[in-house]
């Protein structure tokens, strides 16, 4: 089992209870989408799974171990097996794309190799290969400040794929992309997860993309799991209650398909 949560709660430093009573298991190789209204706790949940935030209560198992029972050094080793794709990747503006991508393996390299890579990228061909999968091979030596928001998101994804993690977490990874590119990018992430038996967990606002690309859908509202269903079982009634008091708009679909709904965010 890649992930196991039992009675998890997480309270922020200001006292806000962001996650409450979460019970969840995700097996190796599963592809899971987390959906829900803004402020539901999706990003907090992903940071918890990445061992970036400790739970306030409950039991957490990530890749077979409790991250917060480990020493700092061993927890850092665990994190090298986990990639977290941020909605706005924290990439230095003047950093070149090749360096940003190869930084995905800094947690697996020693200090000397990491410093050398900052001066001269050690695996240009490897970085180019993963960028090519995202149609960014021509941006290899450009600086991050020269890229659009969608291109920066794809660089963040390339960095995560280059890391070769066992657990791939993605927080709104395609929010800055046009619909066609978002669809293509999620298909690529899903195919990578299948080919490499990687566990993929992504938060998405676009419900139709979640239903199209992920076999399992978890709806989160007010820090709680509202439903946990196969994508084929998610109906309008589930989405209506998940997004209660949110403004929803129907997406155009074929006559044979079930109407899917997407929150405006």
From Swiss-Prot:
Residues 3-247 form the ABC transporter domain. Its EC number is 7.3.2.2. The keyword Nucleus does not apply. It is found in: Cell inner membrane. One of its GO terms (cellular component) is plasma membrane. ATP binds at residues 36-43. Gene3D superfamilies: P-loop containing nucleotide triphosphate hydrolases. InterPro entries: AAA+_ATPase, ABC_transporter-like_ATP-bd, ABC_transporter-like_CS, MetN_ABC_transporter-like, P-loop_NTPase. Belongs to the ABC transporter superfamily. Phosphonates importer (TC 3.A.1.9.1) family. This is Phosphonates import ATP-binding protein PhnC 1. It comes from Pseudomonas syringae pv. syringae (strain B728a).
């Amino acid at each position: 089992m890649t992930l196991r949560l039992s009675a998890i709660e997480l309270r922020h430093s200001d006292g806000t209870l962001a996650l409450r009573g979460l019970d969840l298991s995700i097996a190796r190789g599963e592809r899971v989408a987390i959906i829900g209204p803004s402020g539901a706790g999706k990003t907090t949940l992903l940071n918890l799974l990445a061992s970036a935030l400790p739970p306030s209560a409950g039991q957490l198992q990530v890749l077979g171990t409790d991250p917060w029972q480990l020493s700092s050094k061993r927890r850092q080793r665990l994190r090298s097996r986990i990639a977290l794709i941020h909605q706005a990747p924290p990439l230095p503006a003047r950093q070149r794309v090749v360096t940003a991508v190869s930084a995905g393996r800094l947690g697996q390299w020693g200090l000397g190799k990491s410093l050398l890579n900052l001066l001269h990228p050690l695996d240009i061909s490897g970085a180019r290969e993963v960028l090519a999968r995202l149609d960014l091979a021509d941006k290899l030596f450009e600086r991050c400040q020269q890229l659009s928001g969608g291109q920066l998101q794809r660089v963040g994804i390339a960095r995560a794929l280059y890391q070769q993690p066992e657990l791939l977490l993605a927080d709104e990874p395609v929010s800055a992309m046009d619909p066609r590119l978002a669809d293509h990018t999620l298909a690529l992430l899903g195919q990578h997860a299948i080919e490499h038996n990687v566990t993929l967990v992504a938060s998405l606002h676009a419900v139709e993309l979640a239903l199209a690309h992920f076999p399992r859908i978890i709806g989160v509202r007010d820090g709680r799991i509202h439903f946990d269903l196969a994508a084929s079982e998610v109906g309008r009634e589930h989405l209506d209650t998940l997004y209660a008091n949110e403004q929803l708009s129907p997406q155009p679909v074929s006559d044979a398909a079930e109407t899917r709904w997407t929150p405006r965010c």
